[in-house]
Amino acid sequence: LLLLALVVPSASAQALSYREAVLRAVDRLNEQSSEANLYRLLELDQPPKADEDPGTPKPVSFTVKETVCPRPTRQPPELCDFKENGRVKQCVGTVTLDQIKDPLDITCNEGVRRFPWWWPFLRRPRLRRQAFPPPNVPGPRFPPPNFPGPRFPPPNFPGPRFPPPNFPGPRFPPPNFPGPPFPPPIFPGPWFPPPPPFRPPPFGPPRFPGRR
């Protein structure tokens, strides 16, 4: 019983917390990275349901962001400031809480897409669907629709009214055509018979009263 009591505390002392396991995974990513700067944990999703076995792989989803610390310095990422407009990566996979075992499977992709903690369990191989020939069943036949069209009354819009045109007429000069050269007309006058010769009446010598 004493030996069992000594083994149990030693096993519990080797167990890490969920956040410590993720930080260890971030350190491993920085060691395997070929980029110039270190990455630091930016955000950690909610941990899954607690499991008593620390050696069981647990799904994890977190986000890392580029810092200002160069990778060759091997400075702890938690002491580095985030780089302005630095690259952000979304990481998913599984980790263990056992200090002896290393993180199992972590994949990081650049972007800001978020995944839930149970996302790795959905990455299962898709079953290949069996191909069946298309059915050769004739489709239903429907008669063409015979709906009467809408009836609209004829439009009764008054026609446009335009004022009478008031354009001045063209001005032409009076014609100045020379008349045809006709000779003056010669009409014969009326014919009258010549008057008879004048003959004075046969009067005697004049007589005056009172003289003899």
Swiss-Prot record:
Residues 132-201 are annotated as: 7 X 10 AA tandem repeats. GO terms for cellular component: extracellular space. Sequence repeats lie at residues 132-141, 142-151, 152-161, 162-171, 172-181, 182-191, 192-201. The keyword Repeat applies. Keywords: Amidation, Antibiotic, Antimicrobial, Disulfide bond, Repeat, Secreted, Signal. Disulfide bonds join 69-80, 91-108. Its main location: secreted. The keyword Repeat applies. Residues 151-179, 191-212 are annotated as: Disordered. GO terms for molecular function: lipopolysaccharide binding. Pfam families: Cathelicidins. GO terms for biological process: antimicrobial humoral immune response mediated by antimicrobial peptide; defense response to Gram-negative bacterium; defense response to Gram-positive bacterium; innate immune response. InterPro entries: Cathelicidin-like, Cathelicidin_CS, Cystatin_sf. Residues 1-13 form the signal peptide. PROSITE patterns: CATHELICIDINS_1, CATHELICIDINS_2. Residues 14-130, 210-212 form a propeptide. It is found in: Secreted. The modification Proline amide is found at residue 209. PANTHER family: CATHELICIDIN (PTHR10206), CATHELICIDIN ANTIMICROBIAL PEPTIDE (PTHR10206:SF2). Belongs to the cathelicidin family. This is Prophenin and tritrpticin precursor. It comes from Sus scrofa (Pig).
